[in-house]
Amino acid sequence: MTRFDITELITGVIQSASIMAAQKKVDIQFYKDGPVYVWGDEFKVEEVITNYLTNAMNHADGQRRIEIRFSYHDGLVRTSVFNTGEPIPEEDLEKIWVKFYKVDKARTREYGGSGIGLSIVKAIMDSFHQKCGVINHENGVEFWMELESNN
């Protein structure tokens, strides 16, 4: 585990995804106010953020907006990726972390999702002994992960 600036990592992921975001007509807002240092495997954290952002772009609807934010509690940094659109059906919330599970198979075919991304996210976060999750909102869905910080 190394200490790194997650804002720098997320900025890079957003830049890498800019062509896809433009094609999908999605507006990405990243709310940051300077460096945020966390502990983890930078490569694996990048994989989690990339997965969350790609899923958000594929499922954004309505205002087609994605918001990335930080919150802090008990020595942890929570990174949240929210997208406007339809909430995930309540009965599917626990299952989305299972390999090959797809909530809407017809929609998944549209963008070519394999159903393994969130299972990889869960495995990575479990390997860090940290939490990840999903929260439905009236106007969209928020995926989050927590990492230790010394901020």
Give each language-model segment a name.
Residues 2-3, 27-36:
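Conserved catalytic submotifs in the C-terminal HATPase_c
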Residues 88-102:
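Short conserved segment of the HATPase_c
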Residues 56-57:
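Short helix-loop "hinge" at the ATP-lid/N-box region of the Bergerat-fold HATPase_c
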Residues 112, 117, 121:
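Short alpha-helical Gxxx[C/S/T] motif in the catalytic ATP-binding
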Residues 63-75:
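Short beta-strand/loop element within the Bergerat-fold HATPase_c
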Residues 129-130:
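Conserved glycine-rich
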Residues 45-46:
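A residue-level detector for a conserved hydrophobic packing site
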